[in-house]
Amino acid sequence: MDTTSGALKVAVIGAESTGKTTLCQLLAAGLDGLHFEEPLRQWVARKGRPPRQGEQPEIVEAQLQQELLGMQQAIAFGKRWLFCDSAPLVTAAYSRYYFKDAGFDNLASSYHRANYAATLFCLPQGLDWVAEPGQRDSPKAREAVHQILLELVKPIDSERLIFLSGGLKERYEFASASLNRLHSEFARGPETS
């Protein structure tokens, strides 16, 4: 993970209807960052349907391209943060839930540990599930994907994994405080003995 560019990349993950997109928008505005719309959301809007199993790599590729472009823009504009609305780890969770396919797990987990300065995990607790035809499935799906994500985040460094619950205001305040602390740690650099 490159922390020398001045911009830190943050994955904002969670199951459907957990406030990821709104939180990314709030954090980008409040913490001098950039964000991009979730590639899966864009894909579904463009195609008018959810992806099939064989189309999952297309979603991951779009995510990685958005992250690369986003980091280039964050650096060019002197931003402190890039907030990634979702991550390949979420695609892995959806692949498991909808297709019983764990084939993305190891790659997504390795990529995640190596490429994000922090992970904001948006929990379902505190936010009601809100229907969004074509984009969201059900409260049952939200809970099932949440449980899969809990399993997938276990290998992530606990100091860089921030769990968020409550309303959007509480999530924003806790995330902001946590990320400001993290940014200070990166600015100080590694401690030497």
Per-segment meaning from a language model:
Residues 1-7:
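Phosphate-binding P-loop
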Residues 12:
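Hydrophobic anchor at the beta1->P-loop junction of P-loop NTPases
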Residues 16:
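The conserved Walker
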Residues 20:
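Conserved lysine of the Walker
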Residues 25-68:
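Conserved substrate/cofactor phosphate-moiety recognition/catalytic segment
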Residues 58-114, 123, 129:
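Glycine-rich phosphate-binding loop used to anchor ATP phosphates in small-molecule kinases
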Residues 99-170, 183, 187-192:
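A glycine- and Lys/Arg-enriched "phosphate-lid" helix/loop adjacent to the NTP-binding pocket
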